[in-house]
Every structure is written in C-alpha cells, then in structure tokens.
Amino acid sequence: MAANDRPDRSDRGADERLRATLAAIAPGTQMRDALERILRGNTGALIVLGYDKTVESICSGGFNLDVELSAPLMRELAKMDGAIILDEKATRIIKANVHLQPDPSIPTNESGTRHRSAERTARQTGFPVISVSQSMRIIALYVDGRRHVLDEPSAILSRANQALATLERYKLRLDEVSGTLSALEIEDLVTVRDAAVVAQRLEMVRRIADEIQGYVVELGTDGRLLSLQLDELLAGVEPERDLIVRDYLPAAAGKRGRSVDDVLRDLDALTPEELLDLGTVARVIGCGGTENLDNPVSPRGYRLLAKIPRLPCAVIERLVEHFGTLQKLLAASVDDLQAVEGVGESRARSVREGLSRLAESSILERYV
C-alpha cells in the first residue's frame, strides 16, 4: 500500500484540535448559546478563537474589550458586522468590530466573503475561526485547513445512536471470540488465527468507539447519556488490547525488537481494508502472515492473570517472567508460585485458585 494512503500522525493532531474546538462550542457552553442567538437573529458573524501578534497584524479598526464572554453581548457585537476576537479558551472577548485582512494569496475554496476571510484567517494564524452565515443559516468551523459545519444536535444524536448499535454488535462478537481464545489458551490449542481474530475485533471496537466519542464531544451536555452507554460498553477493552499484544508479540531480538506501543500504533495505522485481512493483522502483531494463520502459538499468560482480582501489575510481570508461558503457570503449584519474588503463601493460593476457576469457567463456556 502506498505510504500516502496510511493515516498521517499530523491528521491525528488535526483531529484532536478539531475535537477540542468542538468541545469549546458544544451545546451547554456560553459560546454555543451565543452562536445560536446570532443564528436566530438572522445575523452573520466572524469569530477568531485566539489572539497573538499574527492575529494582531491582520486586524484593522475595531475596539478593545477584554471582558468575559456572554451570549447576549456576543449577539449585540455581531450586529456590528466586524469580526470578534476571543481568547483561545473562548471565555473572554478581546476585540470586536474588527476588519480582518488575511493574505489574499492563501488559497480558499469558499465563495462568500465572510467564509473566504474565515478560511484564510484560520490558515494564516493557526487559530480556529467560526463563520456564521446569515443567508445559508449555517455555522462553519475552520481548523487546520479543515471545514466543519455544525449540525443540529438531533441529527448528531441520530448518527450516534446508529454507531452505538453497531458498537453493541461488535462488542458482542468480541466477547465471543475472546471467550473462545481463553478456552483455547487453557487447552493449549491456540493458533495464530485465534489471536489475530481477537486483536482484529479489539481494534474494530476501538475505532467505532472513537467515532462515538467524537459525537459525545460535539453534543456537549446533550451527550451525557450517550457517554455513559459508551463507558459501559468499553469497560476493559483498552487494557485487553495491550494484553493481547503482550501475550503474543515475539520476544525482542536486539535493536530490531518492537514494543507493545509500536504494535498498537501499527494496528491503529491499518486501513479498514487491511484490518479485515487476518493475515495483515497477524503480521502486525508479529505472528507472521497469511501462511502462518494455522500455526500453533502459546500465550505468556497476561490476559488470564489480569482477570484474577486484586493481582498487581508488578506481580503479573514477575509471574510471566518467571514461568514464561501460560501452560507452565497453569501447571505451577502453590509452592512453585511462592518462589516468585513478591508472592507469599496467601497470594500464591489466590493465584492458583483464580487460574483454576478461570480454566473451569472458560471450558464450560465453550462446551456447555
């Protein structure tokens, strides 16, 4: 695949800045109330979210205010037809009735005067710029060369609910394949395919959840219930991504060894088409390609040890380092477990009983 087809890290940064700006103007904020008032009053507006020497250099006229932002005041200032300059947090009004003179050589795809000025100002200064169109009755946000039109909360909520239904189906399938993998790990019957399927499903769940999180940000106070539902569905998913890689990533070989973070970044960088290919997923997690999918592989035991209540991460690391594989852990007696640093008799019994319970429940879930 061509390098320019892959997600760029600069795009990731742009997404984060757009999301942060959307949070500052989401429903429930003074800024969003101000924008709604301007729109309802059939008035246009040009608002810059930030002020520095670059912004100052393209400002002409207007007057200084430096007062706390309020929706009624913003509505009145918008009637003057000049641009309004706010601080970066969108909590204070710095200047009003300003004539912006951005570099006319900066390319823009907009046709309206206000929108052209907004896009050029955003590109030249690096600050987000909001344009409220009087004729089209839309609110457009310009951030890092992107244009984002604010939708009605009802439309966003409709899309979010569809995405949430998809996430529920994805999570159900993830639970199924994860349970199957646990049973296969206990029986020492895992193949590369089994591990790759779980890694694939975890990444698919993470991606749809990230999309929903964007809707939560854009909905502001209207997205509280959606946020609670998302948190409930995602409980334990992020740690599971880390654990599946720790279990199956081959041991580092000198300087060429890849870290868990490297693998997670590579999974994140896969295109949707690549993510559907189990061979590609297997290659990313270090288990070879399509030709190796049916090869047997043994986990280290991170996933199952993490399911034992009140077992610290440091102890899990020492147990895995000492025994090396899950099968050796399962075969270990209480005395064997006590030989590990930081594991006393009480904890050794807890680990032994926990592994036995997990083995029993995993087998029952698979065959009963």
From Swiss-Prot:
Residues 101-121 are annotated as: Disordered. It is an enzyme of class 2 (transferase). Keywords: ATP-binding, DNA damage, DNA repair, DNA-binding, Magnesium, Nucleotide-binding, Nucleotidyltransferase, Transferase. Coiled coil: none annotated. It catalyses: 2 ATP = 3',3'-c-di-AMP + 2 diphosphate. One of its GO terms (biological process) is DNA repair. InterPro entries: DisA, DisA_sf, DNA_integrity_DisA_N_sf, DNA_integrity_scan_DisA_link, DNA_integrity_scan_DisA_N, DNA_integrity_scanning_protein, RuvA_2-like. Homooctamer. Belongs to the DisA family. HAMAP family: DisA. This is DNA integrity scanning protein DisA. It comes from Acidothermus cellulolyticus (strain ATCC 43068 / DSM 8971 / 11B).
